[in-house]
Amino acid sequence: MGYNRTEIPLISAERSITMRVLDIDLDFFLADCCPLAELGHRPSLPGHEPWEASAVRAFLENQCGLSRTAPKPGRIFETHDQALTFWEEQIAAGRLTAPFDVTHVDAHSDLGIGYPGPNFVLFNVLSMPVPKRLDYAAFYAQKKLDEANYLLFALAMRRISSLDNVRNPRSRADIPQVLLDADGNIHLNSLTAQMFAAKNGAEPTVPFRVYDDYRDFRAAGAYDFVTFAISPRYAPKEADGLVEVVGEYIKKEKNFCNGC
């Protein structure tokens, strides 16, 4: 399926309203979370059946406020860390202002529960001046940034003003508690961060809300962008039919999704 480039209007310099991004993963729309498949392979279908298309549309329209007749600018991609690349491109183009609110609809938190864990960000990245943190290509080169921790990097880059995590009912506990303050909000903190606070400024507290039951979620307002990841190692190939369903709500710039 080919997606044509569309023009996304530039935001005005005077805009002060916090922008909002809806960030979805295909694995949210499964009966249960899949174990991570080997590179080049997909999880098996039994126990991980995809939702019916009608249920996906009901969630997107009734709870996220999306419409097929007025799709939002965005992108479909293979792995979820490409959301970070997309956001940085939109910021550079003057279409997205940071920090922005993120609604993360995903079976996983993507906050770094697996290797290399949160410590690289807490002790290495937080020692850097904020402009240097934005060099995400360097973190890719070091094999530290991936689809399981890109949101943690986005937080360290101070791109996110608030984060909602809408989870699959069968999601496993994967939110690193070290990232949370006493109120359950995200506050990246470490001895390293404290040592460099005079130079880098204090790390912001980011309001964080978790919806373990997605039925409790209702979008607080309209979204400016929608991104959607297929995450093939986390979803069986039988779920790929939902890519086109979700794609009806996204005004694609270009075909960034191989094989969609």
Which residues fall in each region the model found?
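Short, Lys/Arg-enriched N-terminal segments with co-localized hydrophobic residues
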Residues: Y3-T18
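Conserved alpha-helical scaffold segments that buttress catalytic/binding sites
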Residues: R20-C260
